[in-house]
Amino acid sequence: MSETFNSSEFLKTVTSSPGVYRMYDVDNIVIYVGKAKDLKKRLSSYFRKNLTNVKTQALVARIANIDVTITHSETDALILENDYIKQYMPKYNVLLRDDKSYPYILLSNHKHPRLSYHRGPKRAKGQYFGPYPNGGAVRESLHLLQKIFPIRQCDDLYYKARSRPCLQYQIGRCSAPCVDNVSLKDYQEQVALASLFLKGKDQQVTKALVAKMEQAAVELNYEQAARYRDQITALRRVAEQQEVSHSSGDMDVIGAHFASGVACFHLLFIREGKIFGSRSYYPKVPVDTELSEVLRAFMFQFYLNSDSQRVTPKEILVSDAFEEQAELAGAINTAQQRKVEIKSQVRGERAQFLRLALTNATNAVNTRLAHRNTVEQRFLLLEEAIEVSHKIQRMECFDISHTMGESTVSSCVVFNREGPNKADYRRYNIEGITPGDDYAAMKQAISRRFDKVAKAGKTPDILFIDGGIGQLRIAQKVVDEKFVALDHAPTLIGVAKGEGRKPGLETLIYGENEESFTLPADSGALHLIQQIRDESHRFAITGHRNKRQKTRNTSTLESIEGVGPKRRKALLQHLGGLQEVKSASVTELVKVPGISLEMAQTIHDALRG
C-alpha cells in the first residue's frame, strides 16, 4: 500500500450502500475494479492484517487511491462493474480479451434481396440471422446457402452494373435477378425458403419444396421439377450432417477448465435443437486466481457486454456453479428484458451437451499448455545459446518486403514466452526513399519503432533483423542512438539466409560486435528464431501485397485524364474491382454515377488501348 494512502481514514468515508470501487496505483492507473452489496464491508476486507490470498496481498501493496461509485442496487453495480472492467482493463481483474462483435447473415431489404456477411451495428434494413459464433461459420453458411437457394450475394453496386449474368449464374449459384432472368415471384419464393432455412425450419422448407416439385410434375414442367428435386436432395444431405436435438431448444452450453494459469471456456451454441456452432475463449488471468473467480468474471463480462448484439437464450448451462449465479440471471433480465435460467445440475441430453463442452475446454487447455511448454523450452535453449544473463521476455523481428522497390512495407512481429503476441504486431509503410534501398527502409522502420523510446511501449530483450550484415549495422546504429541515455537496450541479432535459402543453414550475427555463429539444424533455439523470422516475413509480404494491389488499382485509373479520386472510387466500387472496370463495356461504364457517355468512352479506350 502506498505511503500516501491512509486506509483507516478512507474507510471512515465509505457507506454501506451497494456500488462499485476502482483501485489506482501511484501512476493513477486503475489496477482493479470490484463491486459490492455493502461497500464498507467489502473494502474493509482488503485491509485486514491476516490476508492469506497472494493475489490480494500484491494488489493491496500497490493501492494509492480508491474511487467509489454508489448505485441504486446490486444489479446496477454488476452492470457498472462490467463496464468499468471493459473501459480500464485493470491488471488484477480477469479479462475477456476476445471482444469482437458477433457476425450475422443479413438478408437485405431490396427488390431482389441479397444474402451477405454482416458484423457491427445493425444499420442496414433487412432481416438479421444469428449471431454466429465466428466469421468462418457465417462464410460456411453462405457457401451452403448458395448451393441450395439461387439468391444473389453480390453487392448492390455490382448488381446495378450488370448487363449480362455473371459466373455465379453459369455455375448454378444465382438466378441472375440483375438481368431479370428470374421472375420476381419465383425469386421471392426462394428468398422466403432461405429465410425459413436460416430460422432452422428445415422440415418446413423440405415440405414446401416437395409440394412445388409435385405441382411442377403435374403441370409437366419437368425441368422445374428437377430443380426442386435437386434442392430437396441438397437440403436432406445437410440435415443428415447436423446433430439435432428435438427437446433442447435454444441454449448456451459452457464448459470451463482452468489449469496452470490457462483458462478456457468452450461454448456450444444450441439453436432450434442443433449445434449452431462453437467457440473457445481464453481470458487473461492474473497470477494466483481461483477457478471460481475466473468463471464468475467470464460469465459477467460475456453476458453483460453492452456492445455485443447477441441475444441471450432462455437457458444457459455451465459445467460449474459460480458465485452470484442468480444475480447474473437478474442482471441479464434487467439489461436485455428477458428471463434467463442458469443451470449447472442437469440430466439426460443436456448433461451430454455439458460433457461435450467440458471435454473441448479440457482439450483446448491441454493443447495450450503443451504449446506453451514447447515455446518455454525453446526460450530456455535460446537463452543458453546466446548466453544472456537475464530471462528473455519479449522478442521482436523486422523484415522488409517490396517488388522491385514498389510498395515497400516493413513488418515488426512480437513473441513472448507464450508465442506470438499479435496484438503488438506493427507494419510500417516506407516512404521517401530510393526504391529498392533496403538499408534506408530498415533505418526508417527501426527509427519509427523507437522514435520516442520512453513511450515506445515494451522494449524487446532481443531484436532480430531478417537480413545480412548491412541491414544489421543500420539497425544497430539507430538503436544505439535511440537508447543512448537508457540503461537497457535490446540485443540485436541478424538472421542471414544460408546457401540456397535452406532452413537450418542460417548464419546468426551479433549486432554489437558483428561476431557470427551458427546453431545446429535440430536446435530448438534455432527453430524459435526461424519461427519469428518466418512470421515476420509472412506479415511483411501480406502487407506489401495489399499495398501493391491498392496502388496498382489507383495508378492505372490515375493516368486517365478526367478521372479523379471520386470517379476512381465510384468505378471500383460500382463495378467491383480493376479487372471488372477493364472488361466493362461503354454501356456498363455509363451506369456508374458521375460517368458521362464521353467519359465512359475515354475510359474504355484508355484501358483497351
From Swiss-Prot:
Transmembrane segments: none annotated. One of its GO terms (molecular function) is DNA binding. Its main location: cytoplasm. GO terms for cellular component: cytoplasm; excinuclease repair complex. It comes from Shewanella piezotolerans (strain WP3 / JCM 13877). Residues 203-238 form the UVR domain. PANTHER family: UVRABC SYSTEM PROTEIN C, UVRC/OXIDOREDUCTASE. It is found in: Cytoplasm. The gene is uvrC. Keywords: Cytoplasm, DNA damage, DNA excision, DNA repair, Excision nuclease, SOS response. HAMAP family: UvrC. Gene3D superfamilies: 5' to 3' exonuclease, C-terminal subdomain, GIY-YIG endonuclease, UVR domain, UvrC, RNAse H endonuclease domain. Pfam families: GIY-YIG (PF01541), HHH_5 (PF14520), UVR (PF02151), UvrC_RNaseH (PF22920), UvrC_RNaseH_dom (PF08459). Belongs to the UvrC family. GO terms for biological process: nucleotide-excision repair; SOS response. PROSITE patterns: GIY_YIG (PS50164), UVR (PS50151), UVRC (PS50165). This is UvrABC system protein C. The UvrABC repair system catalyzes the recognition and processing of DNA lesions. UvrC both incises the 5' and 3' sides of the lesion. The N-terminal half is responsible for the 3' incision and the C-terminal half is responsible for the 5' incision. Interacts with UvrB in an incision complex. Residues 16-94 form the GIY-YIG domain.
